[in-house]
């Protein structure tokens, strides 16, 4: 299977399946000298791990990370960093009845036609279980970006199903299971998700992730535009069906006099571009939103076919997220960090000595 690696100078190659012995990744290209411990990575993994509330899968995985290489005496050496997360709570018997059938909305049918074989246990390689190692790799990227440039990457949920979530303050995001920036709406979200779960159904979600303090100039036009790579990274996350940067699809109804972000000596007057113009960072906040489809594994009867092409009716039982988007915020943060660190290193390699007389202006003066 190709396609398990991303990045040019900071590369990440992931491996493993949902019900195999473990999952992991190899991070190559991390600059030497970064203070790094398993605890640094674990902080991010704990934000994503399953079983943390009744609104996510009840699979109990500690997601304990092991650093196998690339770190000596607490600092990165510049050599490949191998990370391993062992699976401890597989329940493969839940999938015995679907080994010969294809779950609607899943990759089963596509994997079977492409490879002539598939691992039915939890979706195998196509499972969102794989995203844990992206969060682990992203933790390294976030730490380096913050220490080198002061970049802060964070995300919050903006909508679950029909419930829009207002933004009040970043300080509230870590205090509830929904990554909500509004604590007052949490009871409504609890009630809404309880109703979804009791109906044996699932629901989609939307979230926003931003990066502050990104320098102006990152991005490689034409085909390696910063926003193109961000969209590529976000679309690689399981269940993501749409990506917006800045105004996104909202720009369709905007006029040029509104959408174009005016520059003043004090700073940009707006940020409809989402921090990227011409594929290059403007120095403004990188602003990304993603749409996540409803979890396909539900316990309601659904029509499908088996390997022989015969019609079947199936129910997917097991421990599944009624809203997979709830745990996606740390994943989206990680993917944004991985894109930014790769472009940071590429920019430093080619244009690190470039200086211009024009001062850098403020990101947004409102």
UniProtKB/Swiss-Prot annotation:
Gene Ontology biological process terms in this record: amino acid biosynthetic process; aromatic amino acid family biosynthetic process; chorismate biosynthetic process
Q: What is its EC number?
A: 4.2.3.5
Identify the residues that bind FMN.
125-127, 238-239, 278, 293-297, 319
Query: Keywords for this entry?
Result: Amino-acid biosynthesis, Aromatic amino acid biosynthesis, FAD, Flavoprotein, FMN, Lyase, NADP
Pfam families linked: Chorismate_synt
> Which cofactor(s) are needed, names only?
FMNH2
GO MF assignments: chorismate synthase activity; FMN binding
Q: Binding positions for NADP(+)?
A: 48, 54
InterPro entries from the UniProt entry: Chorismate_synth, Chorismate_synth_AroC_sf, Chorismate_synthase_CS
> Any note on cofactor binding?
Reduced FMN (FMNH(2)).
Q: Which reaction does it catalyse?
A: 5-O-(1-carboxyvinyl)-3-phosphoshikimate = chorismate + phosphate
Q: Where does this protein act, in terms of pathway?
A: Metabolic intermediate biosynthesis; chorismate biosynthesis; chorismate from D-erythrose 4-phosphate and phosphoenolpyruvate: step 7/7
The reply on keyword NADP is yes
Gene Ontology cellular-component terms for this entry are: cytosol
Concerning its family, UniProt says: Belongs to the chorismate synthase family.
Job of this protein = This reaction introduces a second double bond into the aromatic ring system.
Subunit structure of this entry? Homotetramer.
PANTHER family tied to this protein: CHORISMATE SYNTHASE
User: What is this protein's record name?
Assistant: Chorismate synthase
Q: Which species does this protein come from?
A: Chromobacterium violaceum (strain ATCC 12472 / DSM 30191 / JCM 1249 / CCUG 213 / NBRC 12614 / NCIMB 9131 / NCTC 9757 / MK)
Source taxonomy: Bacteria, Pseudomonadati, Pseudomonadota, Betaproteobacteria, Neisseriales
Q: Which gene encodes it?
A: aroC
């Amino acid at each position: 299977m190709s396609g398990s690696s991303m990045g040019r100078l900071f590369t990440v190659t992931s491996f493993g399946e949902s019900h195999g012995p473990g999952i992991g990744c190899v991070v190559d290209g991390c600059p030497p000298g970064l203070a790094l411990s398993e605890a640094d990575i674990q902080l991010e993994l704990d934000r994503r791990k399953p079983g943390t509330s009744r609104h996510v899968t009840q699979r109990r995985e500690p997601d304990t990370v092991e650093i196998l290489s690339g770190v000596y005496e607490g600092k990165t050496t510049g050599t490949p960093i191998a990370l391993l997360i062992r699976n401890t709570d597989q329940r493969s018997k839940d999938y015995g009845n679907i080994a010969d059938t294809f779950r609607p909305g899943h990759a089963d049918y596509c994997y079977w036609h492409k490879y002539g074989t598939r691992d039915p246990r939890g979706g195998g390689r196509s499972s969102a279980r794989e995203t844990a190692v992206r969060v682990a790799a992203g933790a390294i990227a976030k730490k380096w970006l913050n220490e080198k440039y002061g970049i802060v990457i964070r995300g919050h949920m903006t909508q679950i199903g029909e419930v829009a979530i207002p933004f009040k303050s970043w300080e509230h995001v870590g205090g509830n299971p929904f990554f909500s920036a509004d604590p007052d709406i949490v009871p409504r979200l609890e009630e809404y998700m309880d109703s979804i779960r009791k109906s044996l159904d699932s629901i989609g979600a939307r979230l926003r992730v931003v990066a502050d303090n990104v320098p102006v100039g990152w991005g490689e036009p034409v085909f390696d535009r910063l926003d193109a790579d961000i969209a590529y990274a976000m679309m690689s996350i399981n269940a993501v069906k749409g990506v917006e940067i800045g105004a996104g699809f909202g720009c369709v109804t905007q006029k040029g006099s509104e959408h174009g972000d005016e520059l003043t000596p004090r700073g940009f007057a707006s940020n409809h571009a989402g921090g990227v113009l011409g594929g290059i960072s403007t120095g403004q906040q990188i602003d990304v939103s993603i749409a996540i489809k409803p979890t396909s594994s539900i316990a309601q009867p659904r029509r499908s076919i088996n390997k022989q092409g015969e019609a079947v009716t199936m129910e997917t039982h097991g421990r599944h997220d009624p809203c997979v988007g709830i745990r996606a915020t740390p994943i989206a943060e990680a993917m944004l960090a991985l894109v930014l660190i790769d472009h940071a290193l590429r920019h430093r390699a080619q244009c690190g000595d470039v200086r211009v007389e024009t001062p850098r202006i403020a990101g947004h003066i409102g």
